Amino acid sequence: SFVERSLENARRAKAKEDWEECEKYYNMVEQYEPTNIEAIFYFSYGKARMALVDSDRFKREQKIKVLKNSISVIDDNYDSSPKKYEENKALIQRINSDLLAFLNSSFVMNTTTEYGKNGSYTTNDSEYTYDMFVELSLGMIESIEHIIHTIPDKYKTTYLWKIIRQQYAYIYSVCRKTSYRHNYKNKRQWLDSINRVDEKLKQLDPNYLEADLEELPRTTNEVNAIIAAAIVIIMIIVLVIYYISQSM
């Protein structure tokens, strides 16, 4: 059928990361099947992917807002009938995986040179994009929580709770960035959320072992700060040893 051919073309385009073609074919599918979750998500996903290389932050915000809206209606169009469970599970897991790949992608940022008492320093507007990313992650969490409530067999929601856990872990990783100072910087809040999800997963699966929260690589500023602190400590130790030797 036309829809099946369009889906095949869209998936091939996505596999090749041809986001313009991906957007085009998923748009065709959505026109014929307005409740098709795959088409709803990936049509806006392709747009958002292209926005990452656009230096205009406001255009990026517009495209990411469309993706956020698409995520928010995943649960509205979710078919909770038992016969669709495995198909839906595979699709939701794929969407989550691709969303996490998007959230961890590089993106164009604008830099500015500013001047202070200690000379010049460079800043960038990456925090605004990270705000957008966190909002996507929160939108995914909300949509998944709504889907969980539609599944009678709670043991079949285990994979959905794991998705929620992954999204909270992503938000926590943003908070740990030294450069991030914006709206979602309360690390304790996200750690508490992760712990609550871990407890839920242990109830559903006694063999569940929570994944370690990966430490982010240290930034250049963090490394420089550690080196500077180490030098100061070494100098203090040397001075103490010197004064002790002089007093003997």
Predicted regions and their residues:
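Residue-level recognition of tetratricopeptide repeat
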Residues: 2, 35-36, 154-158
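Alpha-helical segment of the N-proximal tetratricopeptide repeat
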Residues: 2-32
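Short coil/turn linking the two alpha-helices of tandem helical-hairpin repeats
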Residues: 11, 44-55, 100-127, 172-179
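Alpha-solenoid helical repeat scaffolds
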Residues: 27, 38-43, 57-59, 68, 138, 142-145
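Juxtamembrane boundary at the C-terminal end of a transmembrane helix
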Residues: 238-248
